[in-house]
Amino acid sequence: MADELDVVDIEGDECDEIVGDLSSAEILQDQYLQSAWRTNSSVLPWTLDSSISDENRQVIESMLLEEQYYFASKKAPKVAWTNEKTKVKKPLVKSSAAQTRWAEEEKELFEKGLAQFGRRWTKIAKLIGTRTVLQVKSYAKQYFKNKPKAEPAAEVTSANVTSVSSIQPHVSALTNAVRIERLSDDEDVDITDDFSDSELQSKKQPERSVSPDCNHHGELRPSLSDALLHLPSESTAADGQADPDFSEDTEIHHSEIDSEAVEESGNPFINLDSPSKHSLTGEEETELADKCESAECLEEEVEDQEEDEEEELRAPEQEVELDLNTITEEEKQAISEFFEGRPSKTPERYLKIRNYILDQWRRSKPKYLNKTSVRPGLKNCGDVNCIGRIHTYLELIGAINFNCDQAIYNRPRLVDRSRLKESKDSLEAYHLAQRLQSMRTRKRRIRDVWGNWCDAKDLEGQTYEHLSAEELAIRREEMKKKGPRPSKLPKQRGSFDPFQLIPCKTFGEERQEPYSVIVCAEALIVMDIHAHVSMGEVIGLLGGTYEEEDKVLKICSAEPCNSLSTGLQCEMDPVSQTQASEVLGVKGLSVVGWYHSHPAFDPNPSLRDIDTQAKYQSYFSRGGAPFIGMIVSPYNPSNSSPQSQSTCLLVQEEPGPSGSHKFPYQFNMQCSAEPPDWSEVMRRAEWVVFKYRLCHGSVPMDRLFRRDSSLTCLEKMLLSIRTVLERLSEVDIETFLVQLESLFNTHFLSETGSSSTHLYETATQPQLLSFLSSEPISSSATEETSDGHDEPNTTGPDKLEQSCVEEEHDETVMQSTSAETV
């Protein structure tokens, strides 16, 4: 019995089925065939005649082997013909097709991975484990190519199923289409060829031919091979009747196979009585293989043409109106980066960018809206690339730049041919998203005859003038006489000097003083001493109180600060700022202003001073507190008086034809008759002396401050301070001035190489202080002279809260100059 055999031969015997009733014609005899040749479709009956000579036998054998290799792509068997009837067990050797055959488990994993990962072949290959990425892609290509063919085949009418199942021998033929026998676990099953056994053909009944799909690889289509593998194993080759336990599903599978075979063969009924009508000769096999290959090539070409046609995107026929409050599904697919849960790219941000671009298009319509024009209004909304992609998407769908000549709808893109063929809307959105990955193709720009850039279309239809060398030279001379072409570089603004001095305006009837300013003598003395000792600008803070009801600002104290040089300007040292603020806070005073010096020019603010003052005012006005600025000019050449010049100012904005401008306004400040705290004044004077005595930018206090004066800088400073203290008692004034002069003579002049003898020589042979001009000292000169401590300054209010460092003090000097001696 066939069901008791130990060998499974499911390749089928093609020659048995094709030959038909050859056994009855006494042409095909088993003793002439060995099992190795039984599966060869190219073996014909006449090749087995024993009367053929050995020489002809070898020629025919070689021809058959070559023909077999060409059509079946199998290794030719090396078994020779013999008249002995030997039953040899067919060795189960894997062919090239068998090596790529997929098991059911692998197919299930492939479908599972396809549903989970899509067309990510690398992940699917990792999921399967036994297949490479190339094998997965190759199988997927056949899978998707045959899938649409298998689905229509399943739609078989019930009438056809009934008519097919009603024929008893037909079921038996299908059950024997593949010989199912018991196998051991370690044996392979080759399902390359599936044909019915020759034992069934002796019944001489008209049946439909069961043939596999044409494939130049020699493999079955997955759906057909699956159907054959699901046939019941109880069927045998010798059994001519249908299995009573045959299920309805199996019949449906059979009908699918038959219907597909009928469609491909074109002849639903084949008479097995005439072998010449249904047997495949070599020419027919060649023709059949050529048809299969040409059909597959044609199908691939059609698919390629379809994909190429899909790449072309037509221009929108009408303008699209988008709802400003909703986001469509097409937008989510095309601009998916904003809908992936990223914290920096949210749907709200996409809506903001899209609506802004749409709004700009409505304003500029019908003028073309480019990407550059929308970027300034979308700051902090993402990188320019994502804004550009949204712009391109809106242009492609016709939401913006509709009917504009500059709009470009067909852009080059990378075609992903492995993508699933989804619905029309999804496919269009996918193509649209692919186009967004490529940048806009720029129009070609060329130079005209004058060398200027222009569009290539502008030069169309022009005739070029061919000039000789002499004419060209004359033309160039004429162009030179006309003058050079204006430069296309952006025009520079008018010369902007940050150190340009701006005269202060005065308050009057049109603009009254916002409050009155009273300055105590203590603050004026400290500012005057600090400004006299340095050739560069010095800087400090002002402390005082503000009476809101009376609108009176009283400046009670001045705290000198260090300065930091940045090459072009100097700023207040944040450490020293913080220290000065804390000292004023301990006294119960608030920071109500700042001061700096103009050593050798007018006490008018520069453009940079105005900007700094405006920043301070903006910072301190948040709490409702006023903030003023003071400028002290000790060595102004235009001032012949020994008294230093000072200005108290405030910056206010005024509207103008080109916008609002900031102008400085000068207060009419009043001096307070309140006596200063002498100990605090001497403390700050000591800080100034020990700070600047070794600085390169310190003023030599023993030199004359003017050519037409006999006063030294120290004497000039003492006279200026005396003028401030003229309302106080003479005793207090003299005591303080003697103490101050002693401090400078002992610790300032001695450290700079001065002595009493030198002072005497200075009086007899005066040396002038080297202030070159009335303009501000340049930054380079300031760095060279003041060692980076005193320069033109600007200070930011944001640095008032940093830490501070105290200067070193000489304890013996502090004791000798204490307030007790005064």
UniProtKB/Swiss-Prot annotation:
Residues 313-411 form the SWIRM domain. Pfam families: JAB, Myb_DNA-binding, SWIRM. Residues 97-148 form the SANT domain. SUPFAM superfamilies: Homeodomain-like, JAB1/MPN domain. It is found in: Nucleus. The keyword Lipoprotein does not apply. It comes from the Eukaryota. Residues 189-221, 235-267, 775-822 are annotated as: Disordered. InterPro entries: Homeodomain-like_sf, JAMM/MPN+_dom, JAMM_MPN+_peptidase_M67A, MPN, Myb_dom, SANT/Myb, SANT_dom, SWIRM. GO terms for cellular component: nucleus. The keyword Coiled coil does not apply. Keywords: Activator, Chromatin regulator, DNA-binding, Hydrolase, Metal-binding, Metalloprotease, Nucleus, Protease, Transcription, Transcription regulation, Ubl conjugation pathway, Zinc. Belongs to the peptidase M67A family. MYSM1 subfamily. Metalloprotease that specifically deubiquitinates monoubiquitinated histone H2A, a specific tag for epigenetic transcriptional repression, thereby acting as a coactivator. Preferentially deubiquitinates monoubiquitinated H2A in hyperacetylated nucleosomes. Deubiquitination of histone H2A leads to facilitate the phosphorylation and dissociation of histone H1 from the nucleosome. Acts as a coactivator by participating in the initiation and elongation steps of androgen receptor (AR)-induced gene activation. This is Histone H2A deubiquitinase MYSM1. It comes from Danio rerio. The gene is mysm1.
